[in-house]
Amino acid sequence: MFRKFAKNEVEPLAAELDRTHQFPYETFKKMADLGLTGLPIPEEWGGAGATYLDFAMFIEEIAKVCASTAVVMSVHTGLGCMSIYLYGSDRLKEKYLRPLAKGEIVGAYALTEPNAGSDAASLKCRAEDKGDHFIVNGSKIFITNGGIAQTYCTFVKTDPTAPPGKGITCLIIEKDTPGFTISKPVEKMGLH
């Protein structure tokens, strides 16, 4: 099924997506309709209940014909969904994981920073716990699905006194959160 889907639904659009730098909305919707956007997520949370090996084989088949679409899906499911599935409360799973796994919304993962790269131990982005919300200050870059996603699993330093690599929290930030801004995409080679 994965190979057939990749050949029939992904490959015909790959060159155009690469040329136009567009998100594969049409393909993402078809994946959602088939239960592929939440492949390794249990059915109780809106996923297909497949194994992570199944998910890896799916991504491999997509990557054979379109690396960009494979990255979109691996970030959405492997990072956006799995971060919440593995570490989120039932309340967070109900609110975010279920619509992510069903492909009703798109997920992103925000770790990389301008001055720290993807080194989580060197994060500069800070979040201050205000009891019922956090105040986040900092910047992230190179966010796959950035600008498209509705939720961002965002890694921040919540304890500035903690040693490097400690005192880090993953916050789910919604796209329409006041103060959350998305800059113009960076021009890069490949993986648009």
Regions found by a protein language model. Give the residues of each.
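Amphipathic, small/basic residue-rich leader segments at the start of a protein or domain
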Residues: 1-74, 91-95, 99-102, 106
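Short Gly/Pro-enriched turn/cap motifs at secondary-structure boundaries
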Residues: 100, 115-118, 142-145, 161-162, ...
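A short core secondary-structure module
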Residues: 133, 137-183
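Flexible, small-/acidic-enriched active-site or ligand-binding loops
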Residues: 122, 176-192
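A structural signal for short hydrophobic beta-strand segments in well-ordered beta-sheet cores
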Residues: 125-128
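Conserved protein kinase catalytic domain
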Residues: 59, 81-84, 97, 153, ...
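N-terminal glycine-rich flavin-associated loop
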Residues: 71-91, 117-120
